[in-house]
A protein has these predicted regions:
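Intrinsically disordered, low-complexity regions enriched in Ser/Pro/Gly/Gln/His and often acidic
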Residues: 1-2, 222
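Compositionally biased, intrinsically disordered low-complexity segments enriched
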Residues: 4-5, 199, 214
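Cleavable N-terminal signal peptides
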Residues: 15-16, 26
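Extracytoplasmic c-type cytochrome modules immediately beyond a signal peptide or single-pass transmembrane anchor
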Residues: 27-203, 217-245
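The canonical Cys-X-X-Cys-His
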Residues: 204-216
């Protein structure tokens, strides 16, 4: 696996010094773009993990070589490719401290999972993209005060249960009149404080159907009942609650 670079270590060092400063909310004016970038970082990290599923679940191997450093370096590299923002040079990226806090959360989640990732003799570890995203959201909230989660009508984990706002938006996403793939954003109040809420719809792809497809009610590899999804149907959304000034 590719090892993390010196520039990434420097960037994470900068992040460590500014994480405490990110108790301050995001300035109004660019908050929607910030939320979009946070969603992109989660999607990238989840994609990196998805590529590693066969490696992680190989019962014949012990050390898989899939580390937090590998995750963070891949996320930073792919984020630059998709957004033209280079988090290895944080002083030139607006809100770099916030983005780096999320990358650090992704790194930590992979590092914490090393004992199970590298345990031989097990063909399914349970460290799947949905679990990764949930743990990253929990870690990131502790660092930043920004809430991020996967949610959906057919949620499996209670932490992914949609709140009233999310349930309303999910119904809108499921309406055939809503443009497929179009996110939804609203400035509102949560607990008496101004926030930006963004939800980005996600649709069932081929890799989702092994656990969530047909036949409905059949047990999947995790022991849960399949939901009977079909490819292209609404699977859920990534939800962001971003505090504002």
């Amino acid at each position: 696996m590719k090892q993390t670079s010196l520039s990434w270590r420097m960037a994470t060092g900068v992040a460590a010094t500014v994480l405490a400063l990110y108790a301050s909310p995001v300035m109004a004016g660019n908050e929607a773009e910030v939320a979009e970038h946070l969603i992109e970082l989660v999607k990238i990290g989840r994609g990196v993990l998805s590529e590693q599923m066969k490696n992680i679940n190989d019962p014949a191997k012990a050390d898989k070589g899939f580390t937090g450093d590998y995750m963070s370096s891949q996320v930073v590299e792919r984020f630059k490719k998709s957004t033209k923002l280079d988090l290895r040079i944080p002083n030139v990226v607006p809100q770099a401290n916030l983005y780096l806090a999320l990358v650090q959360a992704e790194k930590e989640v992979v590092d914490e999972a090393q004992p199970i990732i590298n345990k031989p003799g097990i063909s399914f570890k349970g460290f799947i993209p949905a679990v990764f995203a949930r743990r990253v959201g929990e870690q990131f909230y502790k660092k930043s005060g920004v809430r991020m989660k996967l949610t959906g009508i057919d949620y499996r984990n209670a932490n992914n249960k949609p709140d009233d706002f999310e349930a309303e938006v999910l119904r809108m996403f499921n309406d055939p009149r809503h443009p497929k793939g179009q996110s939804y954003v609203r400035n509102t109040m949560v607990d008496g404080k101004p926030v930006l809420r963004m939800m980005d719809p996600e649709y069932a792809g081929p890799t989702c159907l092994g656990c969530h497809g047909s036949p409905k009610g059949e047990r999947d590899v995790t022991g849960m009942k399949k939901e009977g999804w079909k490819e292209g149907e609404l699977a859920g959304a990534i939800s962001v609650v971003l505090p504002l000034k």
